[in-house]
Amino acid sequence: MRFLTSLALALIALEAALALAPALNLPGLATCPELSSSSEDPCVISCVNDESCPQGTKCCARSPCSRSCTVPLLVPVPKAGRCPWVPAPLAPELCLEKNECSRDDQCRGNKKCCFSSCAMRCLDPDTEAPLQ
């Protein structure tokens, strides 16, 4: 009997600790995956909104008649500015450099992932309006 009481108290303490834990801060926008096209999905509503889901999940439509807590897809937030202008080479050149990035979210601070002569680099963005 003591074991069950201790186990119950431990579970209550764990639940309280998880409820007080700070939200997971991930860069980007959390979006729900696409709806399932399967006609076999049962019509079950297991959540009402994101607040009714465990931390790190969202309340998403899984089919036209069901909602459940789901791990969201993260879409990177676009960074401000645009990549600096790089003149094109007059003749093809061999590039021995390796790419440093492939997306803006792989660059620190406000830097953007931009083409720089022959490879992708994290560069400071141009914030001026483009010439017309």
Swiss-Prot record:
GO terms for molecular function: serine-type endopeptidase inhibitor activity. Gene3D superfamilies: Elafin-like (4.10.75.10). Keywords: Disulfide bond, Milk protein, Protease inhibitor, Repeat, Secreted, Signal. SUPFAM superfamilies: Elafin-like. One of its GO terms (biological process) is antibacterial humoral response. PROSITE patterns: WAP. It is found in: Secreted. Milk-specific; major protein component of milk whey. InterPro entries: Elafin-like_sf, WAP_dom, WAP_four-disulfide_core. Residues 23-73, 76-126 form the WAP domain. PANTHER family: ELAFIN (PTHR19441:SF30), WHEY ACDIC PROTEIN WAP (PTHR19441). This is Whey acidic protein. The gene is WAP.
